[in-house]
């Protein structure tokens, strides 16, 4: 498969990183909105897993429909999803592979504890920092992911607020 690319503005990059830091030590998740492989906004979604939000995320069908509605209201298309990996690398897990849908981009951000206390306490203010961010695409045969190239564009406006819509 040819190298697939996804471009996002710096404001979207920052919004995803902040979401991961704010939800640490749990996984965050959200939708990627844009056109033609350019992400112009992200929509945070609730992580409703019952398996333990520290290692899993789940988007309910009703939240998916809400994301589609918000995407349409923003004038974009649903390009994919993002989620964080607390204290783990920004690469897909077997769980991610088992639950991925074709055609979507999957952005993963690694979020790491800044100290041992943060690793033990979800309430530690400023206790986590977003690290690597990667993008992945499900292979056509669904057997694995292919790593894509994540590019960054300039912000849409120098004074623009982070592109989180919720």
Q: What are the language-model segments listed below?
A:
Residues 1-78, 86-166:
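Conserved beta-strand-loop surface patch within small alpha/beta domains used
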């Amino acid at each position: 498969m040819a190298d697939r690319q996804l471009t996002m503005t710096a404001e979207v990059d920052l919004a995803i990183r902040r979401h991961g830091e704010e939800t640490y030590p749990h996984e965050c998740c959200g939708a990627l909105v844009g056109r033609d492989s350019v992400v112009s906004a992200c929509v945070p979604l609730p992580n409703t897993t019952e398996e333990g939000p520290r290692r899993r995320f789940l988007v309910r069908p009703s939240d998916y429909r809400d994301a589609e509605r918000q995407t349409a209201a923003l004038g974009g298309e649903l390009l994919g999803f993002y989620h964080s990996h607390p204290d783990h690398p920004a690469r897909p897990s077997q769980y991610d592979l088992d639950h991925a849908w074709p055609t979507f981009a999957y952005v993963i951000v690694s979020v790491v504890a800044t100290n041992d206390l943060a690793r033990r306490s979800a309430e530690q203010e400023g206790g986590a920092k977003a690290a690597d961010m990667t993008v992945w695409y499900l292979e056509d045969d669904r057997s694995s992911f292919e790593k894509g190239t994540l590019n960054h564009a300039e912000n849409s406006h120098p004074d623009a607020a982070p592109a989180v819509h919720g």
